[in-house]
């Protein structure tokens, strides 16, 4: 009889262990955007605490250096600064575009409209080319930088969100925690970066900017920018831009989310804006 009870207990323990092993797989299947929305926990007095409790992600303070006009009808999806000009890619079906802008005035100096069936996304410069992603069409567009003439295209097998370039590659986001490394000549994928915050995937990575060995990424539906190690994919810091529009007495009712990061290497400053924002901000970071 004792042996019978013992056998039953052993079977029960084995059943519980098997159920626990199945639990992580179910969690992965259900994570999706919910995991991304919870990726930044509540802030503390020092920084943003990582999910595993191992420490705090440092928050970088900023100062506003300049405020420039920005087209309030521009649904900003990509932003690059080069040689005194801004290059901006915008989205929405029927109104997606690629533009060269005067930074000081926000005036459009050159522009090309995308086909109405394409939703424009991230933008990057490579040599004499401008590369622009599209959202769900799996199509990348290539233009001449000087004349905005379309000179080619390429395909990819995921959604297109943000795009930037380091010294060797293009780096592309797709709304998950994965960054895709593309060859800038063939546009073939040659690697990936798994972005984590406190050991957990950081989802909803959007517009990107490569700055001195790190990748700055807008987190969709937030006012935050993650600072990511190019080598490890670990989040090293965070910029919280909540309230930056209100400081300029801009109503947030008519605007969409923060999106758009461009590095001004001449001034060592960062240009940031958002979808339908009437302002573009030049900020300088300083550690807390």
Predicted regions located by residue number:
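A short beta-strand motif characteristic of beta-propeller blades
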Residues: 63-70, 107-114, 148-154, 191-200, ...
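Hydrophobic, well-structured mid-protein blocks that either form specific transmembrane helices
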Residues: 140-198
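Beta-rich, blade/repeat-based domains predominating
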Residues: 72-83, 116-126, 156-173, 199-213, ...
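Blade-loop segments of beta-propeller domains
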Residues: 105-143, 148-160
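Beta-strand-rich domains and repeat architectures in extracellular enzymes and scaffolds
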Residues: 65-97, 111-124, 161-162, 274-279
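Short loop/turn segments that connect beta-strands within beta-propeller blades
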Residues: 101-106, 144-148, 184-187, 229-233, ...
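Conserved beta-strand positions in repeat-built beta-propeller and related beta-rich domains
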Residues: 87-93, 130-137, 170-176, 217-221, ...
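A short helix->beta-strand "capping" segment at the edge of beta-propeller domains
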Residues: 50-73, 103-109
């Amino acid at each position: 009889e004792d042996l019978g009870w013992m056998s039953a207990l052993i079977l029960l323990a084995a059943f519980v262990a098997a159920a626990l092993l199945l639990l992580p797989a179910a969690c992965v299947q259900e994570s999706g955007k919910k995991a991304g929305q919870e990726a930044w926990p509540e802030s503390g007095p020092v920084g943003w605490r990582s999910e595993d409790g191992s420490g705090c992600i440092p928050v970088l303070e900023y100062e506003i250096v300049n405020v420039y006009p920005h087209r309030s009808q521009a649904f900003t999806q990509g932003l690059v600064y080069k040689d005194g000009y801004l290059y901006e890619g915008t989205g929405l079906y029927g109104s997606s575009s690629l533009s060269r802008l005067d930074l000081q005035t926000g005036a459009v100096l050159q522009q090309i409209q995308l086909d109405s069936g394409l939703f424009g996304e991230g933008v990057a410069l490579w040599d004499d080319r401008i590369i622009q992603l599209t959202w769900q069409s799996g199509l990348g567009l290539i233009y001449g930088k000087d004349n905005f003439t379309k000179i080619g295209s390429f395909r990819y097998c995921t959604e297109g969100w943000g795009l930037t370039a380091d010294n060797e590659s293009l780096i592309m986001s797709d709304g998950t925690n994965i960054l895709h490394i593309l060859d800038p000549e063939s546009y073939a994928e040659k690697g990936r970066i798994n972005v984590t915050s406190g050991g957990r995937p950081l989802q909803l990575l959007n517009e990107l900017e490569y700055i001195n060995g790190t990748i700055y990424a807008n987190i969709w539906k937030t006012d935050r920018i993650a600072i990511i190690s190019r080598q490890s994919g670990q989040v090293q810091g965070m910029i919280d831009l909540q309230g930056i529009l209100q400081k300029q007495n801009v109503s947030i009712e008519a605007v969409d989310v923060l999106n758009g990061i461009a590095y001004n290497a001449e001034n060592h400053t960062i240009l940031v804006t958002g979808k339908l924002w009437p302002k573009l901000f030049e900020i300088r970071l300083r550690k807390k």
